[in-house]
């Protein structure tokens, strides 16, 4: 066991210290269009499906589908397909960069192991899409089609990730893994909501399969955390989320107006909330946020609150402090009460209206106007 631990530490060090090769930065997709893949995904023939299953080290579920699907269950499956399609695009781009040793993605002795791991992950995500869309098709519902995605992982045009140390431009392997860990955390929280909604709407026949996906995503998350030299598990009860928060977060990676049928998903999209603070250590502190002045409309900042979601706790509501209007943005601060609640792992932040207390994540999302701001602390 001790030898294994030391070997793992040395392996991780080789990944984090690998120097850029100096090769030009490039991207698999210049216009954000990643599909179809070589195996025919997202609509593979039988041979393509077998290839995907071989790469995923397992098969699609072959049991009988449930007898019926509710309207809320349909929304669940569409959201799952939307998210998993993005993940396939993301990991396909990441595999391309590692395979071609794009600047920032030369992993030295860890190259082959990482490619083997990521190839398994991307094939597993493809099966998640096929399973969700297959269920929709079985119940004569419209399947979710791919969008175009902002997955140029070697480009500073990509989004930024707030971690417990700094804002990381996604321009290298470590930044990409940190981003993957954060959106996987959001998925793990959202699938809790999905399963509860299935159960409430007599779609319990889908809970077992989706829970197996929760386990798969959690295995991935532990791997991503290990690659960042973090503990494999962040907290005893993972942060919950809601479908609306996930639906909004996914669209940060989507080229606007590129989704053929995202409008068939009846979920709410919030206005953007930026986490401006670059360093967020594990302690009580004020965090700076911002949102666009044009999105504020007739809202009064005196009526706004910054609300946090962490673990399985009730939402934490904090008042705005130091509100400033600068340029086209509204800046404000709010207390991040880490010490009071041990806010490790993912915290979801949102600007809410109409209350200083919310019973649960659903009530918080109903009152949210801006969000989600995603914060990772370890």
PLM regions: where:
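Fungal secretory targeting signals
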Residues: 1-26
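All-alpha RGS (Regulator of G-protein Signaling) helical domain and cognate RGS-like helical scaffolds
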Residues: 22-378
